Amino acid sequence: MLRRFAGLLAGLLLACTASAGAAGFAPHTTAMHTVTRMYVFGDSYSDIGEGYRDGNGPTSVAYLAQRLGFELMPANDPAAHGKSLDYAISGAKTGSGTGHKFGSALLGYGMRNQVDDFAAQVRSHQITFDPNTTLFFFAGGLNDGNLSTDETVANLEGEIRTVYSLGGLHFMVALLPTGIPDFSAVATRLDPALAHIPAELNSQLPGAKVNISHWGPFYDEVLHNPAKYGITDTQTQCAGRAIFHQDATPCTSPETHFYYHHGHPSTATHKIVGGMLYDEVKALEKQGML
């Protein structure tokens, strides 16, 4: 099934390489070692339990980690020491935000705060990592509707700079899905600016390899071509959210629904996208760009 996506993926990577050259820097020539550790910062589309899992199972980054051969765990999991960690929090903007509690769930804890938590753990030696085999994945902006494009870009670039100052070298910055109605406007506005982040940072951070991930377009691919991936319903949610006192009774076939909650993909969709992310990472490694 994912083989059918190979042509599109190759085209996206070719476009990424071409835009890199046009921006005034050469594609990377030294491939990173195989990814053995990953740290994720983002919002509900990546949250696997740090704040609130807005769906019925793992998100795409967790499936990416699984395909890479390791487990991704919520950063607040007591058993997470020495593991790949997911700091993503549902409702997060790319900037700062202390968040708010809904019962046991935490919503809106900003990506700046997530990165600061990671930085504090590195500085206190609770976290150590090998820069040559560690990937830092940033997927944010869906909740930045009231921030300017410049603010979003500055937030993400500042967070990448912080991680770079701690020794990070390998980064992916996600483009956003433009086909999902709830987020179409902000994604369409932000994506052209997000696409320029690698060119800017690679020229300023010696040794860093910052790449775009077509994470958002991968969701769009599934949404626009559902039959290829075994998805039959791209319109209706499978269940409501219990934390908002909605009927959380699941539909009879969540594995065929693009959405599980309103505006948020099912874990079946996330698994498909996770496979695409894996192909993307491996293609970038092979090209020496990651």
Regions found by a protein language model. Name each.
Residues M1-L2, T17-S19:
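Short hydrophobic/aromatic-rich beta-strand motifs
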Residues M1-L9:
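Bacterial N-terminal signal peptides that target proteins for export
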Residues L9-T17:
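Bacterial N-terminal signal peptides
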Residues A22-L290:
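Conserved active-site regions of diverse hydrolases
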